Amino acid sequence: MKLLYLFLAILLAIEEPVISGKRHILRRMGNSGICRASCKKNEQPYLYCRNYQSCCLQSYMRISISGKEENTDWSYEKQWPRLP
């Protein structure tokens, strides 16, 4: 019986959390991307999810393609929010 509980605990720890509907949070985008067949009005498609749906991000999200922060002349208040 203890072996069964151990197996269930390991199985639950390995599985990704279940989210209702067909939305899956895309972890590599800082938990900000949602996989959808089509994005809402205030969202922009960015890359694709594993299930070939668009990864939708809020329109105010700024993504750096180069992987390094760009040096701009913007003041701190005018910068876009950073993804963790």
Curated annotation (Swiss-Prot):
Disulfide bonds join C35-C49, C39-C56. InterPro entries: Defensin_big_dom. It comes from the Eukaryota. Residues 1-21 form the signal peptide. GO terms for cellular component: extracellular region. It is found in: Secreted. Keywords: Antibiotic, Antimicrobial, Defensin, Disulfide bond, Secreted, Signal. It holds the Pfam family Defensin_big. GO terms for biological process: defense response to Gram-negative bacterium; defense response to Gram-positive bacterium. Belongs to the beta-defensin family. Has antibacterial activity. PANTHER family: BETA-DEFENSIN 119. This is Beta-defensin 119. The lineage of its organism: Eukaryota, Metazoa, Chordata, Craniata, Vertebrata. The gene is DEFB119.
